[in-house]
Amino acid sequence: MARHAGAAVLLLLPLLLSGCSYFRGGNGEDELEAEPRTGIRYGVEIDGEGVDDQIRSTLLSASDANQTISRPPASELVLRRRAEADLPNIESGLRSLGYYEGTASYDVRTVRDDNQTAQATVGELRDSVEDFLRGAPTILTYHVAPGPRYTMGSVKIVVTDPQDGFLAPTPEALKIEPGQPAAAQPVLDAQGELVSQAQRLGYAFAKADKLDAVIDQDTKLMDVTLSVTTGPIVHMGEFTIVGADHVDPRFLRRRVLFRPADRYHPDVMDKTRQSLIDTNLFSTVAVDQPDKLDATGRLPITYTVTERKPRSIGAGAGYATDEGPIVSFFWEHRNFLGAGEKFESDLYFSPLRQELSTNFIKPDVGARKHNLLASTSVKAEDTDAYESKSVGAGMAIERPLWSDGVTGSLGVAYRLAKIKPKDEEEDSFSLLSLPGTVKMDYSDNLLDPTKGWRLNFLAAPYTDTLNSGASFLKTQATATTYVRLTDSAKYILALRGNLGSIAGSSRDDIPADERFYAGGGGSIRGYGYQLAGPLNDDDDPEGGRSLIELSGELRYRMTDTIGLVYFIDGGTVADSALPSLEERLFIGTGIGLRYITPIGPLRLDVGVPVNRRSGIDDIVQVYVSIGQAY
């Protein structure tokens, strides 16, 4: 059994790091380039009695001087001019929060520390040298006197030229009420919501009139009048899709979510645009909504699209100590028969597994987002547990379930296989199954998620139509969750759990390549492929009828392109039908490097077994691939 780690880490690190901007080529030598930085370094502070975090945050966002820190002024005089010109922005920021009598002034001071000690950190010493060479940093401080905060007085909503019985919403419905702080943003939001509510009722030409806000310095109140002109209720006219020259118009017609004579609704317009984008046939989709009705008194709509090239070809490569080099190729056509059908052919090759597979998706079968799935595969495997050669085919219907992000499928599959467990006789199987799946995805990114969660559930009854006639039920559930530990997503905690069960037949009656195994890059890192489980007398994996895996990763984004990972994986395989922690628990841990690319992170993981078995487990395992581990 080939279970020996090579010098992969030493070979792979230079390859990954060669893409980083920190290493620049020049006659074979690294060059350290320092950008010359001129001008006065400065920072911006806000202080004053009554200044809280909300005021400070708002004023720093409003300050031009704060937004242009990266462009240091040539002199203190230029900085003072910048600060003077910024005072109206500071006072405008105060008014936006309801402080209509607020004032601001500024001063500029240089910060020096003549008490540097031998205990200074490297960063402090560096700053001290910079101070000596370029001058000490400068602080621009705005001294703010907010004054009294005004509150909302009367709130009136006026409908200009009301038509078709439009009833204006109440101020409470617009989240603007007497007595609340007289801040600007809630008033602007209320004005926008007033127009949006009218449009959602069918008034397509609704628009806001002038907003009146009257300040009373004696009562410290602001009286607000919001007004809207609705125009008539509008009904949809004919729709046109321009630019889809190679797509069946009947398919696109099913993607449009309104019909002529339907009442206008802006959300339906946006959802139709997204429905066209979801076909993956167009690079752009633009909506043209005219500002007047056609001759029939309806509103015609035009969607202008730009077609994508329908074909893609690609290749991938990876490496794992326990599997060897991995290469894959794919060819894809996203408009195979002219109505958004997707056909994909994939080739996967490694020393342990070779597979050629095809997948065909026919969208909108019978109803929108109801897809017909068809697949075929030819596969050969030669692992420490078994040798297997098989051909298979399947068909299923996939559709959305109770909400966005949730899909389900139900189908039928057949696989003819010749399987030889190690040190046993070869046997043939004719497996007929009825697989059903439920998939939930509420994560924010397919290859590099930073928040949200996913849940995949599979259940499939199997029966062998050849010799043994064995029947069993195989189920598996995998859940992952992603938690941002900081607002900037610099630290991510990723957790994964995987449970599996096979009921209805003994382990020996279940085909070896349908049993559960643990160990390897997609399972318990640090252990060889399929080795984190029960072994026979020759130390070959036997597999089991149940599986439990738990994983955790702490992901740290050092820069925009470089990330580090610490991970710990654990789990076991058991002969019982229900997962059990009473079996020996296998734990692996390690670190990883991520290089972020537009197609997802390049992943290098180095794992070690915590409870290593002498003569079975290698000291270290290395994995290289694209995408996060989960």
Description of each model-found segment:
Residues 276, 303, 331, 360, ...:
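Hydrophobic, well-ordered secondary-structure elements that form the walls
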Residues 278, 297, 312, 418-561, ...:
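C-terminal outer-membrane beta-barrel translocator/porin domains of Gram-negative envelope proteins
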Residues 7-18:
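Bacterial N-terminal signal peptides
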Residues 582-597:
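Strand-loop-strand
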Residues 20-54, 67-321, 330, 344-364, ...:
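Periplasmic polypeptide-binding modules associated with outer-membrane biogenesis and secretion
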Residues 162-169, 265-456, 525-526, 530-541, ...:
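Gram-negative/organellar outer-membrane beta-barrel architecture
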Residues 235-238, 249-251, 266, 285, ...:
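Extended hydrophobic-aromatic, low-complexity segments
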